[in-house]
Each structure stands twice: as C-alpha cells, then as structure tokens.
Amino acid sequence: MTSRGTGRWIIPKGWPMKRKAPHAAAAREALEEAGVVGQIDKQPIGSFSHEKLLKKGETIVCDVQVFALEVTHQRKTWREKGKRSVQWFSRAEAARTVREPVLRDIIRKLGKRS
C-alpha cells in the first residue's frame, strides 16, 4: 500500500494502542489501512527506523516492529479505502518497491521463516 502523504510504497504502520498487544495493534492497522484480515504472529519478525513527518512540519524518528500477517482475505470496504493505493506484490517485487533497506531484507526473508 502507499502512504497517504508521499505516495511511496509502505507496509501498514501505526502508533501503540492502549490495552492492545503490539501484534494486535499491527493487525488492527493492517485492517484499517489495507483492509486485510488473517493470522498474525505474536512476535515481530524484524524492526527498522524511519523518519515520519508530522502535520506541523516536525520530523520524528519512529522505531517500527514488523509482524508477519498471513492474510486470509481482504474486505471489500475498510476505513482508509480510497485514501491509499493497495496492490498485491510477489515477495521479490515488494522488496524492490519499498524504500527502506532494512524493510527490503525483512520482506525477502519472509519465505525463509520456519
């Protein structure tokens, strides 16, 4: 999917949620941002840092934990539908498409998990 601001290809991300474990918050963000539902791993498969531009023009560094989600289906409608482009890629295509080098490596290793 693309970011709303820059239109670059990203994975669903969000802020920590009160009373939600990190993996549950990640599953919620995936639903809200890309409309996908499935089984999510409870442990992160990797992490990376990126700069986020806030509404007031301020930039902050965010540490992102990445959780694998085995998608079972995509809903016909979801909260942010129409605000982003959503597209399915092969693992190799996805790795080439994202900008963050660490995220590229995480995506490439997805098929090698046990």
Show where each model-derived region lies.
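Unchanged
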Residues: 16-105
